[in-house]
Amino acid sequence: RVLEPGXEDPDVGEPAGEYEHHLLEX
């Protein structure tokens, strides 16, 4: 599941740290 910046949902089950890391890699 791809979340949009500023709209990340803590219920997604994935740590926000990894989500932000993907944005940076990204």
Swiss-Prot record:
Q: What is this protein called?
A: Conotoxin reg6(gamma)
According to UniProt, the tissues expressing it are described as:
Expressed by the venom duct.
Region span, Disordered: 1-26
Annotated compartments: Secreted
**Predominant location:** secreted
Protein species of origin: Conus regius (Crown cone)
Something else known: The mature peptide does not contain cysteine residues.
PTM annotation (4-hydroxyproline): residues: 5, 10, 15
GO CC terms in record: extracellular region
Q: Which residues carry this modification: 4-carboxyglutamate?
A: 4, 8, 14, 18, 20, 25
**Keywords noted in UniProt:** Gamma-carboxyglutamic acid, Hydroxylation, Secreted
Q: Where is the composition biased (Acidic residues)?
A: 1-12
